Amino acid sequence: MSTALFDLTGRRALITGSSQGIGFALAKGLSAAGATIVLNARSADKLATAADQMRSIGASVDVLAFDVTDHNQVRVSVDAFEASHGPIDILINNAGMQQRGPLEDFPADAFERLLQTNVASVFHVGQACARHMIKRGMGKIVNIASVQSALARPGIAPYTATKGAVTNLTKGMATDWARYGLNCNALAPGYFDTPLNAALVADPDFSTWLAKRTPAGRWGNVEELVGACVFLSSDAASFVNGHTLYVDGGITASL
């Protein structure tokens, strides 16, 4: 089989929340596959630093600063970028946040922030990009879900709810938009060593538990998400729609 199926040359990929962590790793991976990258975050300073790092390895990079939870700001930003730079062919909805705490005491305003950042953002940015993709009759949307889309642990019930919503919103996107030539899927990481998981990575008891609970016996490295993301962003996934691909070291396969 030719590797041309996975070639992203000539395509432009917007990755939300891509100044660090998983988003930045995916940006580097899609660039290595040939894509032009559009980095996104709220902080212009963080974006500039990330863009400089990308360019130092030869990547073609643009930056687009907007708040993924602000519907109007998202739409205006995406429309203006498409008009000035050209089509966004691939969208990676990666922006997200975590907040832990006992469910019985979890603050309502914190729950709302999780919903806005983890779920509403997928709707806002997905809709803004899909309107252009539909006109062109093609596009790839990859929503970053989580192992918590399928499994729960104490102390993260609100986060678990948001990631379950992402997988179902992905199915809805596929159901509505596949007829227009869009492929909408989700990528669900297991436990990866990222800034979002810094507190867990620093906890030796949790790492010991994770090594026993995960068949692969370890934390994931963010680079190990790249292959799955390139696949879902490429022609190789032309008949894949509404699917959630777990990259989790086997944790969802094992009791």
Language-model segments: residues:
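Short C-terminal tail/terminal secondary-structure segment
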Residues: 2-4, 151, 230, 241-255
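Conserved glycine-rich cofactor-binding loop
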Residues: 12, 19-21
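The beta1-alpha1 cofactor-binding region of Rossmann-like NAD(H)/NADP(H)-dependent oxidoreductases
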Residues: 44-45, 65-77, 108, 223-224
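Substrate-binding pocket helix/loop in short-chain dehydrogenase/reductase
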Residues: 102-103, 110-115, 141, 206, ...
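Active-site helix of classical SDR
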Residues: 126, 162, 170
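Alpha-helical segment proximal to the catalytic Tyr-Lys
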Residues: 131, 175-179, 238
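Residue(s) in the substrate-gating loop at a strand-loop-helix junction
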Residues: 146
